[in-house]
Every structure is written in C-alpha cells, then in structure tokens.
Curated annotation (Swiss-Prot):
Its cofactor is Zn(2+). One of its GO terms (biological process) is methionine biosynthetic process. Pfam families: S-methyl_trans. This is Homocysteine S-methyltransferase 3. PANTHER family: HOMOCYSTEINE S-METHYLTRANSFERASE 3, ZGC:172121. Its EC number is 2.1.1.10. Expressed predominantly in rosette leaves. Expressed in roots, cauline leaves and developing seeds.
C-alpha cells in the first residue's frame, strides 16, 4: 500500500519533506470532527469506536483533512487497542482486524482524494498544487493511559505496578500488526512519560520493526512531560532509536511549542513535528474541555511561521483543531518560499 515503505527508514522523512518543498502539513483533531459529523464517541474507545460503528465517518474526516491540505493523515487507532476491543466483547481476531482496517480506511480516503484531484470534481483553494501531492499514512499508537481512559494519559502516572515490561507486553501485538498493515510509518503519540518512550524504543528494536516511526511527546508546562520527566531527556530516547525519523510535540498548548522546538533542535538533527491542541485544556477527571482565556484559532495559526523559523518541519493540529485550522496552516506554508535551500536535518 504505502508508496514510501520501500525507502530506507532513515531517509524516509527527509526525502518526503524534500518532495513537499521542505515543510509538510499534518492533519488535525479527529474526535471532535467525528462528533461534528454526528458520531457518538462517549465510550472508553473514544474515536476508535467509529471503526466499529461508523467507518464512513472516519473516511469523511480523513477526506476533510486531505481537502484542507494535509500531507500526513493519521489513522483512527489512537485508542484502538486489542485489550480495549476485547473488553467490548470482540474476539482477539476481530480486534486485530479492526487495527488493520484503520489503516485500510485511511488509504481508501487517500485514493478517493487523488481521484477527485484527477477528475477536478472538488473545490479546493490550492488545487493547482494538490494533484498527486505526496501524502503519507501514519498509524497512530496511543499511550497505555489512553486505553485506561482514566485521565492517566494526561498525567503519565500509571502506578508502581506498571513496569517497562508491562508496557511492552501491552503494546507489542498492536505495534506488530500496524507495522505490517501497509502504513508508511507509526506515530507514537501523546507520550506522557519517559518509561513509555523507552518501552516503544525497545519494541521497535526487539520486534525488528522495519517501518519508520515518530515519537511525539506532550507537555503541560513547556519543559516536562506530564509525569515530570524532562522533554529533552525523553526525546533523547527517540533520537537514539534508529527507526525514529521525526521527533515532536503534540497535545500541548500552542504557547509552549516555540520553546520546546528550540530545546529539541539543540539535541537532535531529526525533523521536528509539532501538532498542538487548539489552546483549550482537557480536564481528564471530569472529561471535558476548558476554554483557554488567551488563545484563538487565529493565534494558533499565527505561530506557524515562528515555529518554522525555530526549526520545525511538520505542522498540524491535535485536540479541538479543525480542517479550517489545517487549511490555514497549509496556506501559511504555501505562501512561504521553498525550504529547499535551507539546512536539511537528519543527514
């Protein structure tokens, strides 16, 4: 499936960015878009529930982001765990098939989009630049805390009984399946502690995973991940992993991103990916979003040039961002000169 899977793992992202003109656009928030289209995701599976009940809505959201200018679309598998599906009454085999299906749906959306480009049957502001533009599919892996659905994905505190081996055993089969699903890369997202990053890195090595990955951490203060580990120390785990082709930050307030990019740029030459939240804060205990006093969607987009100048190469949105956000990011980047003449990282 993946048109870039055959390339050398270490060069996939730098080659892809070159084809995109130096910068690439990642998609945006998924769950809130599913809700906007009528999905009921009040469930421990969250957006992954729609892989069972409403796969057509998953396709719709992917298409919305592709038509907004995204170069990378992320599967609806963030909360899709074998353990979570089994808890809902599915068999292990059915759960594994849903993981594969999350990737298939994304590829189907990409093909629909490409066909629309060819036929000219769609209305998109950047049509002249969009036809057969490079598009990667990233298979999402959420944290152990996302499966627990108890707010611990936002605290990184899993308890003393959860060791690195516990986390490796939990994630192993899901990573194996997604690595063989045809996805172009695996996106390990919203990593809330160093221990889980180490577990992911070990799994990629132990299972001889042969597709690239990115590690994206979350931060509440612009310095540390939720568990309290330094973001830089966590990122060093990713930087030392040969499969990791980009390192970044997601599910974080926009106001912290610039300083985090500078910190990451000082310790890695790998491309940096940033896809922050809209600026609202999630209350994991009460399961609701709290509106930010100081940031709007316009403020979010106004940061993009600053993030680019600080050293980031891939830009998107996480929770509560929309296709409009991504369209605005794509517009900012398309208005900039090509990055081809700028220093290339990871070489």
């Amino acid at each position: 499936m993946g048109s870039f899977v055959k390339e050398e793992t270490s060069s996939l992202m730098t080659d892809f960015l070159e084809k995109c003109g130096g910068y690439a656009v990642v998609d945006g928030g998924f769950a809130t878009e599913l809700q906007r289209h009528g999905a009921d995701i009040n469930d421990p599976l969250w957006s992954a529930k729609c892989l069972i009940t409403s796969p057509h809505l998953v396709t719709k959201v992917h298409l919305d982001y592709l038509e907004s200018g995204a170069n990378i679309i992320i599967t609806a598998s963030y909360q899709a765990t074998i353990q979570g599906f089994v808890a809902k009454g599915l068999s292990v085999g059915e759960a594994e098939n849903l993981l594969r299906r999350s990737v298939e749906i994304t590829y189907e959306a990409r093909e629909i989009f490409y066909n629309r480009c060819t036929k000219g049957s769609w209305d998109f502001a950047y049509a002249g630049k969009a036809s057969r533009r490079p598009i990667l599919v990233a298979a999402s892996v959420g944290s152990y805390g996302a499966y627990l659905a108890d707010g611990s994905e936002y605290s990184g505190i899993y308890g003393d009984s959860v060791s690195k081996e516990t986390l490796k055993d939990f994630h192993r089969r899901r990573v194996q399946i997604l690595a063989k699903s045809g996805a172009d890369l695996i996106a390990f997202e919203t990593i809330p502690n160093k221990l889980e990053a180490e577990a992911y890195a070990d799994l990629l090595e132990e299972e001889d995973i042969d597709i690239p990955a990115w590690f994206s951490f979350t931060s509440k203060d612009g310095v540390s991940v939720p568990r309290g580990d330094s973001v830089v120390e966590c990122a060093k785990v990713a930087d030392s992993c040969k499969n990791v082709v980009a390192i970044g930050i997601n599910c974080t307030a926009p106001r912290y991103i610039h300083a985090l990019i500078i910190s990451l740029r000082q310790m890695t030459r790998k491309p940096i990916v940033v896809y922050p939240n809209s600026g609202e804060v999630y209350d994991g205990l009460n399961k609701k979003w709290i509106k930010s006093e100081g940031e709007s969607e316009e403020d979010f987009v106004s940061y993009v040039s600053k993030w680019r100048d600080a050293g980031a190469s891939l830009f998107g949105g996480c929770c509560r961002t929309t296709p409009n956000t991504i369209r605005a990011i794509a517009k900012v980047l398309s208005d900039e000169p090509s990055a081809a003449s700028k220093p290339k990282f990871g070489q």
